[in-house]
Amino acid sequence: MSETGTATEKPLFGRPWIFIRGVPAMKFLPPEGPPEIAFAGRSNVGKSSLINALVGHKGLARTSNTPGRTQELNYFVPEGYSGEPGDLPPMALVDMPGYGYAQAPKDHVDAWTKLVFDYLRGRATLKRVYVLIDSRHGIKKNDEEVLSLLDKAAVSYQVVLTKTDKIKDVGVPRLIGETLEKIRKRPAAYPEVLATSSEKSFGLDDLRAEIVRTVLL
């Protein structure tokens, strides 16, 4: 277990975070600069809730019980930086539209999916993708497709199990083991699976510490 509030974590997670930009298409991406950490996952897997829990701000990333509510690449950074050269934030968190089911017209869903895939394939400052998997359902076919895309693009990713408070405690270690076995031969997968619960604040320190290590690499 990581130590909360270490010197390396303080600059990233010891201050308020703000929303800076929603990106509906690749041409609206900010200039490449600070390292980016992205969160991917099926619709309603809990991406926005996890980001809010990580930074300690419940209303930062917009959450909804309606799958497919996030429709853009949403950028969040620590507060206190002008964004001018020489005063850039140390990193950005990117909340991506969910893939899979969404209550929206098919052409909209197709556009979000293309945006996500184009971003994952072609962003030089993308340091790691955290692929969120609902612990109640495990890795599904559309998750496998995203993992394969990341493998082909040689983009480092790590699997994070969400909503572990919804399953029995004894089931978490088993699920971690099963998930590790599924990704064992994937070339771009980080060989450690994290288990989290935004509702119970479980596993958040471990995820924060992993993000810090990734950004500082």
Curated annotation (Swiss-Prot):
Keyword Membrane: no
Entry keyword set: Cell cycle, Cell division, GTP-binding, Magnesium, Metal-binding, Nucleotide-binding, Septation
Necessary cofactors: Mg(2+)
GO terms for cellular component: cytosol
InterPro entries according to UniProt: G_ENGB_dom, GTP-bd, GTP-bd_ribosome_bio_YsxC, P-loop_NTPase
Molecular functions per Gene Ontology: GTP binding; metal ion binding
Residues that bind GTP: 41-48, 68-72, 95-98, 162-165, 196-198
GO biological process, one term: division septum assembly
Keyword Cytoplasm in annotation: no
SUPFAM superfamilies for the chain: P-loop containing nucleoside triphosphate hydrolases (SSF52540)
Annotated ranges, domain EngB-type G: 33-217
Binding site for Mg(2+): S48, T70
Alphabetized NCBIfam families for the sequence: GTPase_YsxC
Family from the record: Belongs to the TRAFAC class TrmE-Era-EngA-EngB-Septin-like GTPase superfamily. EngB GTPase family.
Protein function: Necessary for normal cell division and for the maintenance of normal septation.
Listed name of the protein: Probable GTP-binding protein EngB
